[in-house]
Structures are given as structure tokens and as C-alpha cells.
Design a protein with these regions (language model features):
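Substrate-binding groove of N-acetylhexosamine-processing glycoside hydrolases
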Residues: 1-318
Length: 318
């Protein structure tokens, strides 16, 4: 036998549950155990580490590098040394935030490494949306890896419940936190919070659509879209100095694309519930009940597009 090496993911891309713009969601103690077993077996000649980028994954990469260079290193001790070096006087607050990040991570299956990266808060939502717009109530086999359920409604309910739990686990952003924390771990937790909130609403919209409640489904799809746009805006808001436009080509998870698909879903739901003439919902939203009962053959005002109708619904607080 000759030299041996490993191929290890600090981040990865699977169109399912991977992490690309956020740190590995499994705790560093998990990495410690895995790489400890590697070293125990003498596999230390060659390590290939997959990282989609460096900036979002700096802590994970630094920890792997430490183990590679110096051998087994306790995860807790490394975290403390890392936050002292990277965050300086805010080290204690940073350590708390990192531990909160790992504690909040959502498990989607029974195994220790069935931990959801931010792609889980995006890709299953897109799969469900696409399946709904194709029509029918049968399940989507693209989700069989995690939810091999017989109907689309059951898969949507499964995803809704997980996303609700995920959104609950992550804290709202603290605008008074140190800038470096806002640029890193706090930003990543906010991305999860927003995307999970959007995923839950997207699943609710699909369930309402399957039940024929198209107007409420349309509104929830609009709310979901706003959550994903807010996640993308959070990323872009932390671009400054040499990091300008850093997230502009965020294309592997592509949070903004989830928002685009939700706009398509809004159009689909409006067609189902308000087509082919597209005036009933507008009258229902803009008019008083008495006015809405008076129907003319001709239109007296322009049709609202989907986003304008959604904004009118928000104003009416439907």
C-alpha cells in the first residue's frame, strides 16, 4: 500500500441540503471525530478540501488546517483561540454566536450528519413549486431522498413543518452587534432564518393551492417571496470595502432565484383562481363588498399585475 489521502467537504453542492454561502452546519466536534479517525488510520499524506469559497467558510477551513498541520485538536479549544484571534475584544460574544449557530442547525433525518445547509431552505421549496405548477397531486420523486411520501400535499406538509422549526431556531439580527460579527456568523444565521420562513410560507401556499384556496395561496407565495428577497438583501448589505459585489454571483444556492420562482407560482395561482378574465380578485381587494357586487361588462381600470395586486392585499391586511 502506498500513500493515502482524503477528499473532505468544508462546503458542497448537492441541490438538496448542502451549504454553500454558510458554514458547515455540523458542529466542529463532528469534524474533530471524523478527521481524528482519518489520522488514526494513518491517512495523512494528502488531503483535498472542497470549499465553494473561502470567506463564508473561514472557521471550518482554519480548523481543518490546524488538524492537518498539528494533529488532533479539541474543537472547543480551537473555537476559543479562533474567536480571540479573529474577533479580538468581541471574542466572548463571537464564541456564543458560533455555538448558537451549531445548536440551531436543523436535522432533517435520523443520522448525525443529516444536518441542513442553506440549500435545504431553498432547493426543496423550488422542487415543490415546480411540481405544483406541473399539475396533479402526485408526489415529487426528486424529494424521495428525504421525503418518500405518496402525495405532494404530504411532502409539502413535511417541508412546512421542518421550515417552521428552522425559522424558530435562528435569532433575528442584532443591528448593534460588532460589524465583523454581522459580516459573518450573524449574517449566516439571518440567511437561514429568512429562508426557512420563506420555505414554510411556500409550502403553505402549495397546500392552500391544492385545497383550492387560491387567493390565500397567492398571498402566502408573495410573503414567501419577500422572505427570500430579504435573505438576498441581507447578503448584499454586508458587502463593503474589498467585499463589494461579493455576493452578486451567489449562484449555487441562488436565494434570489427562489424568489423568482415564487413570483411564477403567484402567477400560476392567480390563473387558477382568477382566470381567465382576472378581475374578481382585484375587485375583491380594492373595492368595498357593496362595490364588488356591481359587475360591469367592461373594465373601468387597468388590471393590476401580480406584484401590484399583492401590495394591495398587504395594504388591506388580508
Amino acid at each position: 500500500p502506498g500513500p493515502h489521502g482524503i477528499y473532505y467537504h468544508a462546503s458542497f453542492y448537492d441541490l438538496q441540503a448542502a451549504n454553500h454561502i454558510t458554514m458547515l452546519p455540523t458542529p466542529p466536534e463532528f469534524v474533530e471525530r471524523e478527521l481524528g479517525r482519518v489520522l488514526d488510520r494513518g491517512v495523512k499524506e494528502y488531503w483535498i478540501i472542497n470549499a465553494s469559497n473561502v470567506k463564508p467558510h473561514l472557521f471550518t477551513l482554519a480548523y481543518i488546517a490546524q488538524i492537518w498541520q498539528d494533529g488532533p485538536t479539541p474543537a472547543g479549544a480551537f473555537l476559543q483561540s479562533y474567536v480571540r484571534r479573529y474577533y479580538g475584544p468581541d471574542a466572548s460574544r463571537a464564541e456564543q454566536a458560533f455555538r448558537q449557530y451549531y445548536t440551531a442547525a436543523l436535522h432533517f433525518g435520523p443520522h448525525e450528519d443529516n444536518v441542513a445547509g442553506e440549500q435545504f431552505a431553498n432547493y426543496p421549496a423550488r422542487v415543490l413549486i415546480s411540481r405544483y405548477m406541473h399539475g396533479g397531486e402526485g408526489s415529487e420523486h426528486e424529494l424521495d431522498w428525504a421525503a418518500p411520501l405518496p402525495t405532494l400535499a404530504q411532502q409539502a406538509a413535511w417541508y412546512r413543518d421542518l421550515c417552521r422549526e428552522g425559522a424558530r431556531r435562528y435569532p433575528a439580527p442584532d443591528p448593534d452587534a460588532p460589524a465583523l460579527l454581522q459580516d459573518s456568523v450573524l449574517l449566516q444565521m439571518d440567511v437561514y432564518r429568512r429562508c426557512y420562513a420563506g420555505g414554510a410560507l411556500a409550502a403553505e401556499a402549495i397546500l392552500d393551492g391544492l385545497a383550492g384556496q387560491y387567493l390565500t395561496a397567492f398571498y402566502k407565495a408573495g410573503q414567501a417571496r419577500e422572505e427570500y428577497l430579504a435573505a438576498d438583501a441581507a447578503l448584499r448589505s454586508r458587502e463593503h470595502g474589498k467585499w463589494q459585489v461579493f455576493y452578486a454571483n451567489e449562484c449555487l444556492t441562488d436565494v434570489k432565484h427562489t424568489a423568482w420562482l415564487l413570483r411564477d407560482l403567484m402567477g400560476c395561482l392567480r390563473n387558477q383562481g382568477d382566470g381567465p378574465y382576472f378581475y374578481t380578485w382585484q375587485r375583491q381587494v380594492l373595492y368595498t363588498p357593496a362595490q364588488a357586487r356591481v359587475v360591469l361588462i367592461t373594465n373601468m381600470e387597468n388590471h393590476l399585475d401580480d406584484l401590484a395586486l399583492y401590495e394591495a392585499m398587504k395594504q388591506k391586511k388580508l
